Amino acid sequence: MAEREVESGPRKRFEQKSGAVFDEIVENCGGIMDTEMSEDIDHNLTPTLDSMSYGMPNQTGSENSLLDEDDYFLNSGDLAGIPVVGSDNEDEQDFSSKDNLVSSIHTDDSLEVERRVTQHESDNENEIQIQNKLKKDFPKQFDQVSVFKSIRKDFSLVRENSKETFSGKEKNRDLTYEREKRLDKPHKDLDSRLKSSFFDKAANQVEETLHTHLPQTPETNFRDSSYPFANKESIGSELGNSFASNIRIKEEPLDDEYDKAMAPQQGLLDKIKDEPDNAQEYSHGQQQKTQEGELKISAVFSVSGSPLAPQLTTGFQPSLASSGMNKMLPSVPATAVRVSCSGCKKILQKGQTAYQRKGSTQLFCSTLCLTGYTVPPARPPPPLTKKTCSSCSKDILNPKDVISAQFENTTTSKDFCSQSCLSTYELKKKPIVTINTNSISTKCSMCQKNAVIRHEVNYQNVVHKLCSDACFSKFRSANNLTMNCCENCGGYCYSGSGQCHMLQIEGQSKKFCSSSCITAYKQKSAKITPCALCKSLRSSAEMIENTNSLGKTELFCSVNCLSAYRVKMVTSAGVQVQCNSCKTSAIPQYHLAMSDGSIRNFCSYSCVVAFQNLFNKPTGMNSSVVPLSQGQVIVSIPTGSTVSAGGGSTSAVSPTSISSSAAAGLQRLAAQSQHVGFARSVVKLKCQHCNRLFATKPELLDYKGKMFQFCGKNCSDEYKKINNVMAMCEYCKIEKIVKETVRFSGADKSFCSEGCKLLYKHDLAKRWGNHCKMCSYCLQTSPKLVQNNLGGKVEEFCCEECMSKYTVLFYQMAKCDACKRQGKLSESLKWRGEMKHFCNLLCILMFCNQQSVCDPPSQNNAANISMVQAASAGPPSLRKDSTPVIANVVSLASAPAAQPTVNSNSVLQGAVPTVTAKIIGDASTQTDALKLPPSQPPRLLKNKALLCKPITQTKATSCKPHTQNKECQTEDTPSQPQIIVVPVPVPVFVPIPLHLYTQYAPVPFGIPVPMPVPMLIPSSMDSEDKVTESIEDIKEKLPTHPFEADLLEMAEMIAEDEEKKTLSQGESQTSEHELFLDTKIFEKDQGSTYSGDLESEAVSTPHSWEEELNHYALKSNAVQEADSELKQFSKGETEQDLEADFPSDSFDPLNKGQGIQARSRTRRRHRDGFPQPRRRGRKKSIVAVEPRSLIQGAFQGCSVSGMTLKYMYGVNAWKNWVQWKNAKEEQGDLKCGGVEQASSSPRSDPLGSTQDHALSQESSEPGCRVRSIKLKEDILSCTFAELSLGLCQFIQEVRRPNGEKYDPDSILYLCLGIQQYLFENGRIDNIFTEPYSRFMIELTKLLKIWEPTILPNGYMFSRIEEEHLWECKQLGAYSPIVLLNTLLFFNTKYFQLKNVTEHLKLSFAHVMRRTRTLKYSTKMTYLRFFPPLQKQESEPDKLTVGKRKRNEDDEVPVGVEMAENTDNPLRCPVRLYEFYLSKCSESVKQRNDVFYLQPERSCVPNSPMWYSTFPIDPGTLDTMLTRILMVREVHEELAKAKSEDSDVELSD
């Protein structure tokens, strides 16, 4: 006894410790696992002991306490009851101690009983101390454990075995106590004894099933019955890795009496009610019941019996490893199963009969609860929680984008946001393991890892081995391979295994790996897709799928279209099909579409009647046939029929009389859908002119209240001509055949031609202004429009109503006028003044067909409709209980003899048959009969008075004799001069007999006869050399164009006439240039004639080209007196060296009195050279033209007007150069027509200047004889050829008196002086024009190298001034080329255009004349230049002014203005530009690509047109611009613009 008490002490302590330990563990683990189960759908419980350590402090302090019996940890059987589930993926386990969670999981009932017994035997103080100690130390000691990851079954097994061991130990010691314990609770002990291996399995299944299928039961067991048991080792080997390798567990001997006590008792077993063991026994009597919806009791069985398990755990049976293991498994106490009635919520006792509804998991205690129970409403779905991508850790907002994947070594699935994240995660998780198979390692071609190869791709004759689907997807993406990939998930579709599914959508065949991907793709994309049969547009998510014989899935809008499609396929195939009535294989003659989309085929009409009789039977006799009340539709397809407008026939579907209103509406909708679908495929319209059928958009004509349809515009026009469709033309006011009718401001306007319509619109634009535009909805023209921004585009409407309608149409909320379907309407039609909108062309055809049919209403149709309504409106009592039957069946093939032909003919002919219904009891029969239209009523005749009056007509006969004229004169009056006959010797061939080659025959022989040739020989020429020289001069002087030659010839004649006049007639007269400069004369003439008009300006300008020529022709002051000429040269002898008299160092514009008017700042110039606007609100400036005061000349030899150009410098330089040239000619150094080098040493001329050797050339034309010429010192006496050749040599050989070369600006100054001298002395030659082209080329080459000189005082120096060009008539309106030169000068100076490219960008559209009102009501006229918009890229020929680069968005090109010159109108740029416009053609004044035009070669001064429509040659423009860039004022303006740009940059 003492020993037993000693042993019982440790056992008590062990039970106290183990009870406290596992109470705490179960509560902590249960709370966490309850939370995890609520989050995990698969109920995968997660371990909670990862963060706990298993080392416990020893109570006694001994090192070998683990081997002692007192160690409660190793010997505790309750340790195996810890509900821990091992996870294969250790990365997901992140747990901590959760003491604050309230556990909602109840432990097993056996654990509660054991704990209750332990508490009675233990001391309260020891229990409180042990529990406090364990609560303090237990969480800390289980921090480092990592091997407690076995499945719950493992711990249950250890727990039950240990309990059995301890039960055997206390068998011999406390037998009396155990017997009393069993007597206190007989039901528990009895249930334990009844447990066998079969009952153990059933009890576990019941427990698991209740946990899975009965969520309302409060008890929950966490044992996974589906876990496959294996052969487990002992507790020491199972937990040995967790503690130590040398742990030994104390083994106790088993007691055989305990097993005998636990054996079942036979007496108690006989008292238990036997229940059926399987579902076949209790459901055997239920198979005969066929009425759907009838209450069925699926099972009746005991609550605690074994048959409950197979009913609740179908497909959820555990697999046992061996039969011996069942003996080792302990029995589960029956008290763990507590089932309550779903109706009254009472607890079902053991052995009580329970009832279960078929297909439901709920149990009921009686049939009363079973019949009175109503299904509770479904719980609202839990709020969607945001899922996180396992790869990139981003929240997946859209649940449709979630990709769940389950890996090989885990039972849980992971979520990913995209396929790329899934592939990345797989690569990260894929271990780098070398797999050696027969010492051969295979490497993946994508990830370069040694792994098992799953795919091999032969690409470009190279086999690529891939280890996974992710690598296979990457390989396809990298090489742009369009292989069999699923459109939804991107996976590979193995077409060889039959897993590849095809979907026909949007005209393309898309591949899918499974039917679920097809459904997901339809739901995800939800595209508007046309039906495969009727082509109506529906969302793909709402359409019905059907897979045809080729394996392609097609989409249909309704079951009706699907049925019709199947009928069409069966009909077109022509194969033999089994009849649904007689089961005979034959070609089907009749088809019936059922409500479920299936097709019933019949071989004859008798089979149809037999099949129809099946539906006349009472309900319940045959449940395999779907009743027609669910909405059958009889499909009739008229083969070869065509729906035509204008009296054509339409195919109709006979309506089916049905019992309920809902079914009637369904059938009516189905019949209408079928009718629309088939009519669309065959509908055609009939042209009113050519009577042809067409299926295109019709051409409509609204005439006399009717709409006429035509197949095209030609038929419409021909119909108008034939039927005289005439109306008053709105423009020409003549009644003609209507060509087009357009709506203006709500009224229809008719026009006879396209030209009248355009002219009328042009007149409206003038009256209404620029707002004469068209409404975007009704297409009518209105003066007032309402604007609205739709889709980023501004639309204009005539009224608010049109704007609202267009808005509804734009947002696809409008309905089609034909099919009444809402959506995108892409077609429109104007029908009787209203705009109709349609889905597509088919809807237009349907609408026009319906309108044409509905226009002439038929009495026959009206009668039929009324009869149908009367027949359907029968007694409601009879129609309520009747069963609908098949109304009509139509054959698709030829009608057999047994078929009634009345119905089929009525349908094929398009007539609407009358419907008569005969109702007999529960069955009804409906027949269709064709009723002929009633005969027309007799015509009413009335008396009518007739008044007949003959039409008389008077006929008159007029006789008139026919007269003829005949000449009978006797005297011959010669009307033409007599022809003098001149004998001309003509050789005549006289034929003679041929003597067969034996005699000589005459042969024609030509004799030259001299003929007189007229030649023009000048009488003043005495020698041959002079004649040849004159001829060559004439050839060189005369231009190639005949009109220009006539003009020059006239000018020479005028000059010769002036030279012949005597000196007495050369009195002092006011020269032309004095008139040009005389301010009083100008004010007298110009001020009174200027009116601003272009034509009056051209006439009133006193110095036009025409007046210039007339003035030279009339005046006679060309020849001056000899003494005055000598005096002039004597006075001009001082003007010898230009550069010496005007050195650049002494230049000062202020001292010269050149009062330059202050000019407002111009716009800064952009990169492209055009002026650009300033920012910060600076006011626009106007370029003012600076008038110059006319300075009186201080030098002698100039005109009396005091011009600043001293032309005597040029004259003297020419004279000195000619003297040097003639001196060399006398020495034989110069020859005409050859090129010869002079002496290498410089020579001194008689004036003391040394001239260098130069090249001399006269003419390069062939036939020119080499001869020597002598230039004249008097430039006025030089001919055109001499002047042209001399100027070419002059600019190259002229030197200063000291022998130095002239600067380029000085040479141009001398040439301008020569030009001015020629004009002053009556010569109209302009040496800067095309006849002197050789001289112009050489001069341009010389001036190109010149750059302006910057003086130390900051001024720019150039000897060429603006005034010089005005004086020598290079600026003005004297000729077309001079006027172009003037415009070029103004644009260069004031618009800062410095190269040819910038000038070529000018156009008439960019230069406009404007007027502005100034102070004191004065008006100012100016020219505004709008620079064109420039592109981003820079061109090489653009000159950038300014250092700062601005963005194009910051600057908008603004026009630069140039004001008129009111001080001197002859130099006004505005007036000159207007005169230029007056001489241009009207066709070029609005062009935006040309400004400088080519002068006409044949024009005269009084010609209305000076310029052609072609732009001037860029080479000519470059020659003119080179001379303009020599002007000092031009460079000053450019420098000012550049300095202003710098100031703007500094201010910014």
Curated annotation (Swiss-Prot):
A zinc finger (MYM-type) spans 362-402, 414-457, 464-499, 510-544, 554-592, 600-631, 708-742, 749-788, 795-829. Residues 1160-1181 have a biased composition (Basic residues). Residues 162-189, 1124-1183, 1231-1260 are annotated as: Disordered. Expressed at higher level in heart, skeletal muscle, kidney and liver. There is a cross-link at K250 (Glycyl lysine isopeptide (Lys-Gly) (interchain with G-Cter in SUMO1)). One of its GO terms (molecular function) is zinc ion binding. Residues 1237-1260 have a biased composition (Polar residues). There is a cross-link at residues 140, 149, 195, 201, 232, 250, 260, 271, 273, 289, 327, 400, 428, 430, 1035, 1061, 1080, 1127, 1431 (Glycyl lysine isopeptide (Lys-Gly) (interchain with G-Cter in SUMO2)). The modification Phosphothreonine is found at T107. Residues 1124-1134 have a biased composition (Basic and acidic residues). The modification N-acetylalanine is found at A2. Changing R1410W: In a colorectal cancer sample; somatic mutation. Keywords: Acetylation, Isopeptide bond, Metal-binding, Phosphoprotein, Repeat, Ubl conjugation, Zinc, Zinc-finger. The modification Phosphoserine is found at S110, S122, S162, S197, S242, S1030, S1064, S1071, S1181, S1256, S1539, S1542, S1547. One of its GO terms (biological process) is regulation of cell morphogenesis. Plays a role in the regulation of cell morphology and cytoskeletal organization. The 3'-UTR region of the mRNA encoding this protein contains a motif called CDIR (for cell death inhibiting RNA) that binds HNRPD/AUF1 and HSPB1/HSP27. It is able to inhibit interferon-gamma induced apoptosis. This is Zinc finger MYM-type protein 4. It comes from Homo sapiens.
